[in-house]
Regions:
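Flexible, solvent-exposed loop/hinge segments and secondary-structure transition points
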Residues: 1-131
Length: 131
C-alpha cells in the first residue's frame, strides 16, 4: 500500500522493486532490473539482479520515464506506434527531445494512488513481452 497519497516514497519504491524481482524469479525470468521514478522523473529506487546487463538500469529508467511522458503504459504506447507506421519520423524527433529516454516497448507502467499518477515503474531484462 502506498503510504503517502501525494508522492511515492523510498520505502514504497523499494518494496515495489523487491516484489517485482521476486515475481520475476518465481516466473523464471532472466535477471531483471527495476526502476521506480516519481512524477518529476526522479529515481526513487533501482534494483538489479545479479547477472543483469550493464545497460539495463538506463533501459528501466527510460521505460518508466516514457510512461509518465505519455500518460500510458509502454505496452499501450507500443500498440499506438505500431498502428501508426508514419510516426517513425515523429518518434525519432521525440527521441532527440527526450534525451534518448523514449522506449515504447513493454515493461513500463504508471503507478497511481486514488486515480492520481504518483510515479511509474520500468522493468527490463527478459523478453519485452514479459518485462
Amino acid at each position: 500500500m502506498i503510504t503517502n497519497p501525494g508522492e511515492i516514497n523510498l520505502d514504497d519504491s523499494l518494496r515495489i522493486c523487491q516484489e517485482t524481482l521476486k515475481k520475476g524469479r518465481a516466473e523464471g525470468f532472466m535477471p531483471l532490473t527495476v526502476t521506480v521514478i516519481d512524477v518529476a522523473g526522479v529515481i526513487r529506487a533501482t534494483l538489479s539482479e545479479d547477472g543483469s546487463g550493464l545497460i539495463r538500469a538506463k533501459i528501466a529508467y527510460a521505460k518508466a520515464w516514457t510512461c509518465l511522458a505519455f500518460g500510458v503504459s509502454t505496452n499501450k504506447l507500443r500498440d499506438i506506434f505500431e498502428d501508426q507506421p508514419r510516426l517513425d519520423k515523429a518518434i525519432a524527433g521525440m527521441q532527440t527531445m527526450a534525451d534518448g529516454n523514449l522506449v515504447p516497448t513493454p515493461g513500463g507502467l504508471i503507478i497511481q494512488k486514488n486515480g492520481k499518477n504518483i510515479g511509474s515503474i520500468g522493468v527490463t531484462g527478459d523478453r519485452s513481452d514479459q518485462d
